[in-house]
Amino acid sequence: MTPEQYVQDKAAKSGSSFYYAFRFLPLPQRAAITAFYAFCREIDDVVDEVVDPSVAAIKLAWWRKEVANAYDGRSSHPAMQALMPHTAAYGIEASHLLAVIEGCEMDLQQSRYLDFAGLARYCHLVAGVVGEVASNIFG
């Protein structure tokens, strides 16, 4: 299976309507957003599906290394392999991907925010950064 097939399958199996909306985009944008969406699903699935928070934290640490490796030209995960050809064209920086990981990691540490600043930070990391990347891709 190619990295491109992997991210297509990941997006299709997610059950999200995003997958169908992406089908109407021009091919370069569709490929970029599908790869980015698959990356985000991978990260979110760690937090949602791994029961032991310490195991989830280890997996997220692995993803941090994978992001660094990918930007050094050494990606091993098909989601990153599918995403990397689009990073320069759409301004997708390692900091964007690391922010998504950081935001999802916050789910392991707390489920409720006691102040607006903490909530705003969480929302920025798990949704705002995703919107920034999507707007870069969509133009």
Locations of the language-model features?
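Acidic catalytic motifs of isoprenoid enzymes
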Residues: M1-G139
